[in-house]
């Protein structure tokens, strides 16, 4: 009964916000989002990475791995790629390149690009996201740590991987979910359906459990400045996933 009450209160909270596409649901809302939140152009892939490393994720010259918080220091705002790459970071596509983000706008859309430690990017590969049973985790990844056994401390700071699944650290699970729902909605013509549907339910739970932060809002609007002033609508209006019926309620 308590869980049901919490769920009802959460849904009530969603609908007290300013809504995108007021009164629209399911396919009508999908069509509205495609018409109003699809960027007509993105930066080139090189330029997008420069903006990502030099501005969006650059905090006083520090750029950190999205999944592990491993940090490269002294990153310039101009031409940052050489420093970032030499420090061991590259660009992670939350929606994998091999499953729909291999070229054009889907590849360069910064709403699903993140700085990532090279080996962690490889561990993630093109695997779906999900919850991994701790005893089945192959790699525990945090900062520069790569452990094969369950950590004794700071366990929620670690991302986890197996050869078929990837679980990001707790603090970014909602960010991941909102990026994946964005990509699948906006780029449905190229997005792999199986990849999305096998993880959509857990992603919705992550969306609920890890709400939008001020930092996430600020970043999506910074990105929008380079992409036709279009933010990720799933960050702006957190009721969208529910209203789109993209998950099983």
PLM feature segments, named:
Residues 17-71:
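N-terminal module-boundary/linker segments of secreted carbohydrate-active enzymes
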Residues 81-90, 94-246:
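Domain-level detector of nuclease and nuclease-like folds
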Residues 14, 68-73, 184-187:
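Short, flexible beta-strand-to-coil junctions
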Residues 4-13:
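Sec-dependent N-terminal signal peptides
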Residues 53-91, 98:
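Long, well-ordered hydrophobic secondary-structure segments characteristic of membrane-embedded
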Residues 14-15, 105:
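Hydrophobic alpha-helical membrane context
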